[in-house]
Amino acid sequence: MALSWNIRIRRRSWFRFILPIIVLGLLCYGTWAYCHKLCYEQVDKRLRQKSVSVGLICAVCFLDVVVIFIWLQIVILVGPGTQPHVAPFLILPIASEEKTSNTSQNTSVEYDAVVPPKCYQSDPHGYPIWCSECQSLKMERTHHSSELGHCIPRFDHYCMWIGTVIGRDNYRLFVQFAAYFSTLLLIMWVSICVYIRIITQHNHNYSPNLNANIISTLVFAILGWLLTASLLASSIFYMSQNKTSLEAIIDSKRKKFGTRKIFCYYSEANKLRFVVEFDRSEFHSFWDKKSILANIKDFMGSNILMWIIPLGKPYTSRCKSDGKSGSKTTLVEILGPYEETLSDYTIQAIEDKISRGEYLATLRASGDDSDPAY
């Protein structure tokens, strides 16, 4: 059984590259048809517009290289990212004293634990979400990927055309991929449409002599541009609201089927944790910074120049290494750039619910006495 399961996983890992290979093949075919059949044979040789032909060929080939380079980063060099392992929160004491039967000596057993943050997503009892596959806490906006076998921070979606998951690390590259690919296809189909008319007018006394490869490239370019342009537009729209594609889908289902979202919040005034629930009528973008620029920077990085330069991750800081066994660490130290911050509006909404007595439960966490960096 285990062997057959491993074989299926390996087959799926290879299967996810079938569509990207098809896309790459169509890109190579379209580039050849565009550069040779249109630019060289028609624009250069027939219409005697050598400078235009060279310019179009250089632009298309350059964008081809950029698109392929971005794809390599998205899938291989950068990837979607991996959430660091997060030990259970320090809700119960990490040290337990046991008295042996033969002696009166106490023994202390310590466990790795994380000081709980001020607010985290939880179940109705106030306990954080656990990933049984990774044996780690699953933090906000993190989801487990069965394709890659680990938890992805800020999981957006699985893109079958690219062949991998889009997450925190490669989201900016994904947006740049859609932008550069749509620009490439736009140049191709617009210039083909322009020169089809010129070529037919130039050969009005003869047969139009349009190569079938040019027509097929035009069809593929228009269809591909519609796909990539709509993908780019939806990504920009979701970024402006500080939402991922998965969150938008889940939120719509919550509003339709009445599911809920629950947070465990530490009130400094009451020195107590409250479990607060948001039902479908109270749903909003919990991460929205109330500024389109701030929301986009949260996805694309603070350096605006890097928004157009397709290179690397949108941040430079790293996660700190794990502490010693039995030590207590904060979530900020573990997650580093993967830490997600709720909006001020969401925090205020939680505090308002607490003041009105609208909460599911209360609890005291041992880690709240450890002077956490709230």
Swiss-Prot record:
Residues 35-55, 195-217 are lumenal. Belongs to the DHHC palmitoyltransferase family. PFA5 subfamily. The chain crosses the membrane at residues 14-34, 56-76, 174-194, 218-238. Disulfide bonds: none annotated. GO terms for biological process: protein palmitoylation; protein targeting to membrane. It comes from Saccharomyces cerevisiae (strain ATCC 204508 / S288c). It comes from the Eukaryota. InterPro entries: Palmitoyltrfase_DHHC (IPR001594), PFA4/ZDH16/20/ERF2-like (IPR039859). This is Palmitoyltransferase PFA5. It catalyses: L-cysteinyl-[protein] + hexadecanoyl-CoA = S-hexadecanoyl-L-cysteinyl-[protein] + CoA. It is an enzyme of class 2 (transferase). The DHHC domain is required for palmitoyltransferase activity. Residues 129-179 form the DHHC domain. Autopalmitoylated. GO terms for molecular function: palmitoyltransferase activity; protein-cysteine S-palmitoyltransferase activity. Its EC number is 2.3.1.225. Residues 1-13, 77-173, 239-374 are cytoplasmic. It holds the Pfam family DHHC. Keywords: Acyltransferase, Lipoprotein, Membrane, Palmitate, Transferase, Transmembrane, Transmembrane helix. It is a multi-pass membrane protein. GO terms for cellular component: cell periphery; endoplasmic reticulum; Golgi apparatus; plasma membrane. It is found in: Membrane.
